[in-house]
Design a protein with these regions (language model features):
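Bacterial N-terminal signal peptides that target proteins for export
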Residues: 2-13
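Short, charged juxtamembrane terminal tails flanking transmembrane helices
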Residues: 237-241
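A short, hydrophobic C-terminal helix/tail in secreted or cell-surface proteins
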Residues: 215-235
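A domain-level signal for the mature, folded cores of soluble proteins
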Residues: 30-200
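Sec/Tat signal peptide C-region and signal peptidase I cleavage site
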Residues: 24-29
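Bacterial N-terminal signal peptides
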Residues: 12-21
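Extracellular mucin-like PTS domains
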Residues: 203-211
Length: 241
């Protein structure tokens, strides 16, 4: 009897904990190269949508791994890497582009003049990059360009705010800036992160994976909560016996 009572209490408390978010560890903020990312490592791009290097001299193979632009910045200081393992960034080529996607967060406006999006671009050459953002991967909004090296953009300046959520970022090298030949032609992208981060996608888009809205419990959560409440009821019933 005692064992069953303890089990019931455990299930009940587990259900309550899930319902109210008790015991859920929030994302830990990180500061990278002087930039504060309140959502921590969740702030950075998660998936590659497309990569189209261009130019008179397309970047050499070690500089054409687009997956190196995902996740937090990890540039190791080697601008002249000779193999994929040592290259921690991707070169776009002169006029080339890359489209990246958030899956566990989104980019949103802060409601003020604070910077919302940060692009980590590396290399000794100044290479400007046009930046576009999209909610669905189809309709794009231009939000200016970053002027070489690392730079931040305030998307509120372009009419967006805290109720706008973007899941795609497109970076396009400005062919009129920087070298047009060499082994790492075009902007060299290490990472892209949302300083002002919002919830993950809640609807199905052209390439995004649908997830449950943050305010709605998923089926597994509902079952766990139900089990907890049943356990509580059984415990009370046995106490009456």
């Amino acid at each position: 009897m005692a064992g069953k009572s303890v089990a019931g209490v455990f299930l009940y408390l587990t259900g309550i904990a899930v319902l109210f978010g008790i015991g859920v560890t929030p994302a830990s903020a990180v500061i990278i190269r002087g930039i504060d990312f309140p959502a921590g490592n969740l702030s950075f791009m998660d998936e590659l949508v497309s990569y189209s290097p261009k130019g008179v001299g397309i970047p050499t193979a070690p500089h054409r791994d687009p997956f190196t632009s995902l996740g937090p910045p990890d540039f190791n200081g080697d601008n002249n890497c000779t193999d994929n393992l040592s290259c921690t960034f991707v070169s776009l080529g002169s006029g080339g582009s890359i489209i990246l996607q958030f899956t566990d967060n989104s980019l949103t406006g802060s409601g003020d003049s604070a910077r919302d999006l940060h692009v980590f671009e590396i290399g000794p050459d100044i290479e400007d990059t046009f930046v576009d953002i999209s909610k669905d991967g189809v309709d794009w909004f231009a939000i200016g360009k970053v002027l070489g090296s690392t730079a931040s953009i305030d998307i509120d300046r372009f009419g967006f705010g805290p109720t706008d959520f973007f899941y795609f970022v497109r970076l396009t090298d400005d062919p009129n800036e920087g070298d047009i030949t060499g082994i790492q032609v075009g902007a060299d992208i290490d990472a892209v992160g949302a300083i002002t981060s919002g919830p993950p996608p809640t609807i199905t888009t052209t390439t995004a994976t649908s997830t449950a809205p943050p305010s709605v419990a998923e089926p597994a959560t509902i079952l766990l909560l139900g089990a907890g409440l049943v356990g509580c009821a059984l415990t009370k019933a046995r106490r009456r016996e």
